[in-house]
UniProtKB/Swiss-Prot annotation:
Name of the protein this chain belongs to: ATP synthase gamma chain
Organism classification: Bacteria, Bacillati, Bacillota, Clostridia, Eubacteriales
The keyword Transport is annotated on this UniProt entry: yes
InterPro entries: ATP_synth_F1_ATPase_gsu (IPR035968), ATP_synth_F1_gsu (IPR000131), ATP_synth_F1_gsu_CS (IPR023632)
Entries under Pfam families matching the protein: ATP-synt
Functional summary from the UniProt entry: Produces ATP from ADP in the presence of a proton gradient across the membrane. The gamma chain is believed to be important in regulating ATPase activity and the flow of protons through the CF(0) complex.
Organism: Clostridium botulinum (strain Eklund 17B / Type B)
Keyword Ion transport included in the entry's annotation: yes
Subcellular compartments: Cell membrane
PANTHER family: ATP SYNTHASE GAMMA CHAIN, ATP SYNTHASE SUBUNIT GAMMA, MITOCHONDRIAL
Subunit comment: F-type ATPases have 2 components, CF(1) - the catalytic core - and CF(0) - the membrane proton channel. CF(1) has five subunits: alpha(3), beta(3), gamma(1), delta(1), epsilon(1). CF(0) has three main subunits: a, b and c.
Gene3D superfamilies according to UniProt: 3.40.1380.10, ATP synthase, gamma subunit, helix hairpin domain
Originating gene: atpG
Membrane topology summary: Peripheral membrane protein
BP-aspect Gene Ontology terms: proton motive force-driven plasma membrane ATP synthesis
Amino acid sequence: MGSAGLIEIKRRIKSVESTRKITNAMGLVATSKLRKTRKELFINKKFFEETEKIIEKLASTISQDDDSIYFKSNKSKYKLYILVSSDTGLCGSYNNTVVSYLDSLVRDEKENIKVITVGSKGLSYVKRIGLDTIADYVDIPDIPTVKEVKIVFESALKMYKDGEVSEINVAYLDFVSPVKQEPKAEKLLPIEKITSVPEEFITEPNSEEVLNNALNIHLKGKFRNILLSAKCSEQSSRMTAMNGATQNANDILDNLNLKYNRIRQQIITQEISEIVGGAEAQK
């Protein structure tokens, strides 16, 4: 391999260096987004925990009878799963992991499962496991707001109120740490009966109405918590994938540079040998 080989290797080196710049930049962006989303998740968890305390106190003042839509199930044979996926790719096995987990949950009852996807990537993945979606929500921001939460949750709640589904569940990748994310499913409705020590206090207009309003706010807070956790997992997966790609690019560059220097050394050695040989022939 001569100078033509060196030109080809230099071209490949430039190509890999260009790719490395992109993956490194994407890794840095994912790291920054993860930091911001984790901060928002921490704040929302505090809100979620406080509403939970309020609900426990309110629940102690009334009888959680079968008239409440939040505690009462219905006779529908269908269960609803909200699948939280990503809108963009380059996040490793993030989408495949959560969809495979959903598949394992519903494998024996797929004919009774309805799915709402959050994130454009979930739609194609869900079809691969033989499920159809009834609604798809895309372009969810990196930090989901109350607006997005309300749209998705109220759509699911309407199906539950109308008796179309007997359960509302959410399948997502729960954020444990930057190096650990676990697939998880949480049931939003119906809520299990709340047991707490009775307390005496006055509520206006009445305890039932206040509790129902509080439960609605609480469930939206819980759903936002899930979306934020899933977004953290997505950014963490993307950060890991991009860091891995950058390291692979570094390894390839090391090999290419070594190969380039070896060939260059061979060419120089050959040229020196030819010069020496020519000089010897002149004697």
